[in-house]
Swiss-Prot record:
SUPFAM superfamilies reported in the protein's UniProt record: L-aspartase-like (SSF48557)
Entry's Gene Ontology cellular component terms: cytosol
Species of provenance: Pyrobaculum neutrophilum (strain DSM 2338 / JCM 9278 / NBRC 100436 / V24Sta) (Thermoproteus neutrophilus)
GO molecular function: argininosuccinate lyase activity
Family (UniProt): Belongs to the lyase 1 family. Argininosuccinate lyase subfamily.
Pfam entry (one): Lyase_1
Gene: argH
Protein name, per record: Argininosuccinate lyase
Amino acid sequence: MSFYRSWIGGEGELVRRYTSSIRDDAEIVEEVVKIMEAHVRHLAEVGAAPKEAAEAVAKALREVEPERLLTSEFEDVHEALEKWLVDRLGEEVAGWIGLGRSRNDHVAAAIRLAALRKTGVLKKAVERMRCVLAKRALEYADCAMPSFTHFQPAQAITFGHYLLAVDELAGEFLHVLKPVEELLKRSPLGAGPAGGARAPIDRERVAKLAGFEGVVENALYASGSRFFALALASAVVSFLVELSRAVDDFIRWNSPLVGYVAAPDSHVSTSSIMPHKRNLVTLEVFRARAAEALGHLAALHAVVMKIGMGYSLDLQEATRHLWAVLNIASEGVEVFTDFLEKMSFDCGRARRDAERYYSTSSDTAEEAALRGVPFRRAYFQLAREIREGAARLLPVDEALRRPTRGSANPEEVKRAASARLVFCREKPL
């Protein structure tokens, strides 16, 4: 029988298994231990608990093996940790740890710290991807290809320009993460179950001891809100949704019907009956898991939206969706980066398509307008010539020499990629 509800009785194994979060708590067990140590040290600081008891608990916490806490007989890791401490130190010593705390504020704190840790892992993966993108963009700065709009050949660009578009997406994602990280760095400790603690907890001090940089002011909001989780998961899933568009391009370009991309052998599989097949399975899985992450985001919102402002056990069920989103993102970015490092691009074939499918038509019409012909007149004249097979278009290399910042001009691509690589060299990952 679980520790906290032992005085109630009536618990069966079926119910315990059904309501326990112990398996999911593997994601936060280290943070739970860290927060407990900060809590007991602070109790001693303010004279709310005997110093000797706090020191004994802190020493035991430094010796605990987290995996030993993850046993199915408990409701959650908080209960498992307290029972472990009581068994090890006795109630006269370990019995003080419940003062001034609730599972509500402590689990919110643990989730914030674990989310901050996992966000750091994801950020490093994205930064490394950006460096690979910049390196390959510089390599392919002059590699002409058609862009695609409506899945039709469109304006001529270079593959380097395309890769820098993915890099800019990654940069914007990291920018969006900054204010979300500020939310994660605020501590709910001392908020108690909903209205604060009777013990003289200095919330700023215990926040600092636990590794936070500020506090969530209102105790009800601090213990019961999961806005920080919604914000983080939303940002990550938005990034995955956008990144999966690029992944989809690479899957299409890997088809021999297009033939732009040669995928590395380590990223392809074959058919059990058609031995000629080279299926880009890693990116197919990425695409599917990005969709799965979107489902986790919807589930997270659905769980949170109708439970009132205070804590309910529904929130326990919400947290696993946050971990799923973060884990899917970190693993997917790592795999995609490996693909980007090892793939090759057929510049000759891409250039031939850019020439074949009128990808310099807009530049040709603009060039005529810049020489004094009203643009729409030049546009319709060129349209007639294309229809009649008599169009004389600007050569691809000349069309690419567009003067605008951020264009597909190879010199602009080299400038942007080189600037990013300077950052990569200054901050090696």
